[in-house]
Swiss-Prot record:
GO terms for cellular component: cytosolic [4Fe-4S] assembly targeting complex; metallochaperone complex. This is Probable cytosolic iron-sulfur protein assembly protein Ciao1. Belongs to the WD repeat CIA1 family. Essential component of the cytosolic iron-sulfur (Fe/S) protein assembly machinery. Required for the maturation of extramitochondrial Fe/S proteins.
Amino acid sequence: MGRLNLEHTLQGHKGRIWGVAWHPKGNVFASCGEDKAIRIWSLNGNTWTTKTILSDGHKRTIREIRWSPCGQYLASASFDGTTAIWSKSSGEFECNATLEGHENEVKSVSWSRSGGLLATCSRDKSVWIWEVAGDDEFECAAVLNPHTQDVKRVVWHPTKELLASASYDNTIKMFAEDALDSDWDCVATLSSHTSTVWSIDFDATGERLVSCSDDTSLKIWQAYHPGNDAGVATPDKQTVWKCVCTISGQHSRAIYDVSWCKLTNLIATACGDDGIRIFKETSDSKRDEPTFEQLTAEEGAHDQDVNSVEWNPVVEGQLISCSDDGTIKVWKMTE
């Protein structure tokens, strides 16, 4: 089995820490929390230190931060109903744009692979898609309202302009732009969870999605395209996402976040039972009936709820986590 080794415990935020996000180069990460501040951390020798504190962009808790694929921009989603765009064009990070429109808390933000689109979602049940129109200019391209409850998370597909959202209504929705009229449409609804879907993440290929829920389970979804060799029907020649695996019994409380490593294919979870768990696909797994095993469970990873986990996109096996306990932890997974 594997082992999750704690490398660093970092403090600096006041109160709970909601989100952590690696820079695309893997040598810097950002964190955010209820102190309304963003901290940018870098490795100084063998120690992670706060390089910058951004504290003038939001009036309330910052729920999530995400780096643009080019690494030049950072987007932050806040309970104040706005999304701030930060850039370092002048040498120092500055808030160059504030996106307004959501009626209340913005829960999540995500950049498309090209960096040309940004998605946000909110407690107001809507998903917004923004086009990057030029230097610090963002235009609303779509307001999507297929969810019946609070939308918790938005994540773009790793290679296509396909957006996934997870909601308090127990479903995941997929959105794509119609080639004919340029309207964004809901192209799939993924239903299997029996409670809030807190988070989702694609694998490296984008052919599979993992979801985590208040129902204490993980689900693996497989994309079936028109003409697939498994014989799965695809009405209207639309890709169908089918739940092909449910992973349950390992978590005792809600699973708040999930990260599918693009380098190792390992899945990490952040749980309300203060634990972090790592899952691996078994060697005899089948595409249409995959099986996963728990490699390791770090039961007391934090002293309170673990809110976010994310694998380093460059350094194999490195994981960061953050918690209600006010700490960030850097881990190294060894198999």
